[in-house]
């Protein structure tokens, strides 16, 4: 690494430490020429797959767009930003884990719905109504009935739903 003070090409590492929950390495360096010290941070560059839209266009994965979708669906719902960020991180991890260079936007939409189903059932129905383009009340009823059946079959989901109702409102 070049010294930021004298531009010499030779520096030595004095100290290395893991930071940011082990996702970065902090290195203290010293220039061999001018003896100045400086700090660098090293992190893995994780490339997200490109998104293939329904019309066939391709665009880079946009984490902000993903987060905005969650925020819109969860507006005025009792879900913390930490839970939203964790859901975004889980989706990014699963998308990278596919190993694909490109993914259909439908895959991302289904991942969002899966996370919302666990976070907040009202937000799930809200998102699904837009994502799946519900046309009438029957489609809402069908989705809510499916959620009710799934919740009855899965005690964990029922417990999460009942805990959300215990949150005090203003």
Curated annotation (Swiss-Prot):
One Pfam family this sequence matches: Zn_ribbon_NrdR
Names of required cofactors: Zn(2+)
Chain segments carrying region Disordered: 150-170
Alphabetical keyword list: ATP-binding, DNA-binding, Metal-binding, Nucleotide-binding, Repressor, Transcription, Transcription regulation, Zinc, Zinc-finger
BP-aspect Gene Ontology terms: negative regulation of DNA-templated transcription
Example of a GO MF term: zinc ion binding
ZnF segments: unnamed: 3-34
PROSITE patterns: ATP_CONE
Composition skew (Basic and acidic residues), residue ranges: 161-170
Ranges for domain ATP-cone: 49-139
Cofactor info, note text: Binds 1 zinc ion.
InterPro entries, alphabetized: ATP-cone_dom, NrdR-like_N, RNR_NrdR-like
Protein's job: Negatively regulates transcription of bacterial ribonucleotide reductase nrd genes and operons by binding to NrdR-boxes.
Similarity comment: Belongs to the NrdR family.
Protein name per Swiss-Prot or TrEMBL: Transcriptional repressor NrdR
Organism this protein belongs to: Hahella chejuensis (strain KCTC 2396)
Upper classification of the organism: Bacteria, Pseudomonadati, Pseudomonadota, Gammaproteobacteria, Oceanospirillales
